Amino acid sequence: NWFPKFTPNSNQENQTDTPFYAISIPKINIKNATVSTIDTDLAKHLVNWQGTSIPGKNGNAVILGHSTLPQLFNAKDYKTIFANVYKLKNGDDIYTILNGITYTYKIFKIVVADPNDTSALEQNYDNSYLTLVTCTPPGTTWKRLIVKARLEKI
């Protein structure tokens, strides 16, 4: 596991003020899935990694989720929710709903990285970015699939 130690008390102010928000990815049948900024239990929800931004703010909101074999996908089971992330392409939309505001992100970069590569957590403050991270190939933990998106509209 390449993720740094998670300490809820060291979250950015933005995260503790917004403990949960929702994400929808229509192309892969994810609708209003819960994202937590204060807990790392990937069996209960997706996780917005501590120290990264949140949707609508400049910076990079990094969202982690479990994947598995695509045939086991269940949009209501957080142990399988990212099983079809590999189907996403540049130009696809991701929506986040935070404090009643919908933010539309458009995917612009998809890469596969080694498990010890933490570059997905890096912050860039020139815009609002969203990064999805899951294991790949589906059903393994060999590599990390990283899907980057940029805020298009509010």
What are these regions (language model features)?
Residues 1-154:
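Solvent-exposed, non-transmembrane regions of membrane-associated and secreted proteins
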